[in-house]
Amino acid sequence: MSNSVELSSYRDQHFKGSRSEQERSLKESCTLYVGNLSFYTTEEQIHELFSRCGDVRLIVMGLDKYKKTPCGFCFVEYYTRSEAESAMRFVNGTRLDDRLIRVDWDAGFIEGRQYGRGKTGGQVRDEYRTDYDAGRGGYGKLLSQKIAPNTDNR
């Protein structure tokens, strides 16, 4: 197996099953996790990029669990493992909406996983960010809440 399609060290802590079941699922999966997307990247843009590597079966955009707005990740499922491997080789680390995107193996989409797992509804990584990132909603959400003036106590 080529280095570009090997499993990374990341493991979904919410996976339902044993570590060996998760490893097996990842090694057989046709589903990819795509991260570091702009909040403004569309499903159509994802489809255009990933369909260069094969027939895309399904795209599930990651959503803020409260606002139901995009929050910077998605799942892309192919019909075959070889198509997904091509995407791992050729799409991981490329630019989309002026951002370097990350592509990693996923054990398979399960309903509910499309929602951010952070306290504020988005991704955890966006809650504590201290730098300003226009493509991902500005400053980190928890930092923004501390900075925002409290208008309730007037």
Curated annotation (Swiss-Prot):
Organism phylogeny: Eukaryota, Metazoa, Ecdysozoa, Arthropoda, Hexapoda
PANTHER family per the UniProt record, alphabetical: 20 KD NUCLEAR CAP BINDING PROTEIN (PTHR18847), NUCLEAR CAP-BINDING PROTEIN SUBUNIT 2 (PTHR18847:SF0)
Example of a GO biological process term: regulatory ncRNA-mediated post-transcriptional gene silencing
Recorded family membership: Belongs to the RRM NCBP2 family.
Assembly information from the UniProt record: Component of the nuclear cap-binding complex (CBC), a heterodimer composed of Cbp80 and Cbp20 that interacts with m7GpppG-capped RNA. Interacts with Ars2.
Subcellular location: Nucleus
All copies of domain RRM, residue ranges: 30-108
Keywords carried by this UniProt record: mRNA processing, mRNA splicing, Nucleus, RNA-binding, RNA-mediated gene silencing
Pfam families documented for this protein: RRM_1
Name the record gives this protein: Nuclear cap-binding protein subunit 2
CC terms in the record's Gene Ontology section: nuclear cap binding complex; nucleus; presynaptic cytosol
